[in-house]
Regions:
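Active-site core of glycosidic bond-cleaving carbohydrate-active enzymes
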Residues: 121-148
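Acidic/polar-rich alpha-helix caps and helix-coil junctions
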Residues: 1-114, 139-323
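Mobile gating loops/cap/lid regions near enzyme active sites that modulate substrate access
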Residues: 117-118
Length: 323
């Protein structure tokens, strides 16, 4: 059944639709009983998605409430042991809220996430190694278990970078490894940020330290405040900055960094000295300007071709760095 396309909505209208749909979904899923598989969205996952949306909207109270709901309803706990250092490939781990369980005939082989990330398979991940910003790596404490996610000593590191070891195949022969879409740790970090934004530094530190004690037993945060630098590399020493740093480390290679860059309105600088080959650096785009339209995708031409209520002269997003 064909339906006529609508005209371009405002951002406000889009978010009204998103939040309305999520609220309806959370209510319905809450009444639907226990889900049958980890790949299915349940009430906790829907609450986690709502928390993600609320961060972008800067609706801090909703983000806090949704993150706390996700934590309380998920039955998950902050991961330790192999749930952290085992390759991020197991949908049954106690910290996983939502994931796709990959079996051999669904692996995708070359066209898969772990092929893209895991250099030990000898394919794409080996020819274009994924490496962390060395400045970010330096933020890890001496006893932080997440240091195992990167290998500064690998002889195959490009340009003295630190290759990732966080994401590994579960079975190299079968090309399998589960895809994790949401972990409970993200909800702790979201609750910490939202609390900080609401001027509840004590509550923010409680959530942050609850997570970090499972990563580095020597870690304790006593910081306060919400100041952020113009660039991600500009340091203010605030509590909010510390939460964002730990969010970058904990969720590295997983969810949402591009959304965080946009919503935090921080530019960034990437150089070869930070651990990447020059050929991998972004060229021709002012990455220090978080408001650049270079970060905004254009609407596909097919949408204009098939929708009489869309006008490319009025409804298309600006192209390039146009303000």
């Amino acid at each position: 059944i064909a339906t006529e396309g609508k005209g371009r909505a405002t951002i406000e209208e889009v978010y009204q639709q998103i939040t309305s749909d999520l609220d309806k979904a959370i209510t319905m899923l809450g009444n639907s009983g226990k889900r049958k598989h980890i790949s299915h969205i349940n009430e906790a996952v829907a609450s986690g998605i709502k928390a993600r949306v609320a961060l972008v909207m800067e609706d801090w109270q909703t983000a806090l409430d949704a993150a706390n709901a996700a934590i309380s309803k998920s039955g998950c706990s902050v991961g330790t042991g192999t749930a952290v250092t085992g390759g991020m490939n197991d949908a049954t781990a106690n910290n996983v809220m939502w994931a796709a369980e990959i079996i051999a005939d669904q692996s995708g082989m070359y066209a898969g996430f772990f092929t893209h990330m895991d250099a030990d398979q000898g394919k794409y991940g080996a020819s274009a190694r994924k490496q962390i910003n060395k400045l970010l790596y330096a933020k890890l404490g001496t006893n932080d278990v997440r240091k195992k996610w990167w290998n500064p000593q690998d002889e195959n590191n490009e340009k003295n970078g630190y290759q990732q070891e966080k994401f590994k195949f579960k079975d190299y022969a079968k090309w399998t490894g589960d895809y994790i879409f949401m972990r409970i740790e993200e909800m702790f970090l979201t609750a910490a940020e939202a609390s900080c934004r609401l001027n509840d530094d004590k509550g923010a530190r409680l959530m942050l330290n609850s997570l970090m004690q499972k990563r580095d037993e020597d870690y304790t945060c006593k910081k306060t405040g919400t100041a952020l630098g113009k660039l991600t590399s500009d340091e203010t020493g605030s509590l909010l900055e510390e939460i964002i740093i730990q969010r970058r480390i904990e969720l590295w290679g997983e969810f949402g960094r591009i959304y965080d860059i946009r919503r935090l309105k921080q530019g960034f600088r990437r150089t070869a000295d930070m651990g990447w080959p020059s050929s991998a650096l972004i060229a021709g785009t002012d990455t220090e300007d978080p408001e650049s339209y270079a970060w905004v995708l254009t609407i596909p031409q097919t949408e204009f071709d098939g929708n009489p209520n869309m006008d490319p002269s009025k409804d298309q997003n600006p192209i390039g760095d146009h303000k």
